[in-house]
């Protein structure tokens, strides 16, 4: 995979982001100068889930995975313990469960809202930038990507360290 280990910033030009769903190409987003892509796969260490194609002539800047982690991922991700997360929630913060609806329905945390990772970008205009958000999933894989995306857009996002699997008393 050509783009697997890089984070890209569009210096100039326009791009289309598409994903194959049921054999049909679905337009997910149109990107322009200043926008970036590739962060979800690098943060969550997951497989790329979309194709980005230039719509016009342009220039892309790229960071390799090591530089991305050192310069962007680690400075933006704020991991917190379950105790600190509960304190933030008690002071008006909000749990965000980024798992699939079927997982959320089965064992969500009290008061949590469900915004699956694939929908996080769609929530940018709805969430309050003045509120603390504690993001979680089972293992920290999806939640780290979601917390990064939120923090990158200026939200006060915190990552539940270890996810639900490493916090067995979380649901109490």
Identify what each model region corresponds to.
Residues 5-11, 28-29, 52:
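His/acidic/aromatic-lined binding-pocket segments of jelly-roll/cupin-type domains
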Residues 136:
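Short, surface-exposed ligand- or partner-binding patches at beta-edge/loop junctions that are enriched
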Residues 25:
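Contiguous mid-protein beta-loop-alpha structural module that forms a pocket-lining wall or clamp
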Residues 10, 95-99, 115:
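Short hydrophobic beta-strand that contains or immediately precedes a catalytic carboxylate
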Residues 15, 19-22, 35-36, 41-50, ...:
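Rhodanese-like catalytic fold shared by cysteine-dependent sulfurtransferases
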Residues 1-2:
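Short, small-residue-biased leader/transition segments that mark boundaries at the very start
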Residues 32:
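Conserved nucleotide-binding/hydrolysis modules and their immediate coupling elements
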Residues 89-90, 95:
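Extracytoplasmic/periplasm-facing segments of secreted or lipoprotein envelope proteins
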């Amino acid at each position: 995979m050509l783009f697997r280990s890089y984070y890209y910033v569009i210096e100039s030009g326009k791009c289309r982001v598409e994903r194959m769903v049921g054999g049909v190409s679905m337009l997910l987003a149109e990107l322009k100068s200043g926008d970036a892509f590739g962060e979800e796969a690098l943060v969550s260490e997951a497989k790329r889930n979309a194709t980005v194609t230039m719509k016009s002539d342009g220039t892309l800047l790229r960071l390799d995975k090591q530089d991305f982690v050192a310069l962007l991922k680690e400075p933006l991700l704020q991991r917190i313990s379950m105790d600190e997360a509960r304190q933030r929630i008690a002071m008006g913060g909000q749990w965000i469960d980024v798992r699939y609806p079927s997982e959320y329905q089965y064992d969500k945390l009290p008061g949590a809202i469900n915004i699956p990772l694939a929908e996080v970008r769609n929530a940018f205009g709805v969430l309050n930038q003045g509120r603390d958000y504690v993001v979680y999933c089972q293992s920290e894989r999806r939640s780290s990507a979601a917390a990064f995306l939120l923090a990158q857009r200026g939200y006060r996002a915190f990552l539940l360290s270890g996810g639900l699997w490493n916090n067995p008393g979380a649901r109490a």
